[in-house]
Amino acid sequence: MSLELLEKIERIESGYGEKLNSPIDLDKIKSLSKNEINEVKIFIEQEYSRFLTKVNGLDFNGSVLYGLKTDDNCSAEVYDFFDYNNIWHEVEENKRFVFIGENNISWFVYNLSNDEYLELDMPSAEVVEKFNSLDDLLESFLSDAIEYAS
C-alpha cells in the first residue's frame, strides 16, 4: 500500500482543517469483529487489517474506504465495513463480494469465489478493472481520489 498517497491525502485534508481517522490496532480490529462469523470477518482480519492499522477508513472527495466503528472519537465519519457489507449483501448476487469501498461511480470489492480484487461499475456491477492484490486496488483507489481532487 502506498503510504505516500495517504500522506498526500492527509496534506490536502489538513489544508481544509480536516484530519484522517486514526489507525486502529489489531487487538481492536479483532475485538470489533468478534461477533461476525463470515467471510467479511476473515477478510478484515487477514487482509484489510493492514490498511486499518494505517487509517481507520477514508472519506475523501467522494471516495470512501470502509473502516470500523469504534467507541473512540474519530476525526471524520467512519463508514462501517460490516454495516455496508450487510447492506450490499441484501442483494443475493452481491454476496460473492466483500465490499471494500466506493466512489461516485464504482464499488471496490474482493471476489470471494475467484480470489480477485475488482472495481465494479456501480449501476451494472460489470467489471471495470481487475487488480493483482489489495495493495494494487488501494493504490489505484487513492491515486484516482487524489486526481479527482485536483
What are these regions (language model features)?
Residues 1-107, 149:
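A surface-exposed partner-binding patch
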Residues 31, 117-118:
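Glycine-rich, often proline-containing surface loops adjacent to acidic residues and nearby aromatics
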Residues 37-40, 123-130:
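Generic alpha-helical structural element
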Residues 48-51, 110, 131, 141:
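Aromatic side chains
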Residues 104-107, 115, 124-125:
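Short, solvent-exposed loop/turn segments at secondary-structure junctions
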Residues 126-148:
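Compact, glycine/acidic-enriched structural inserts
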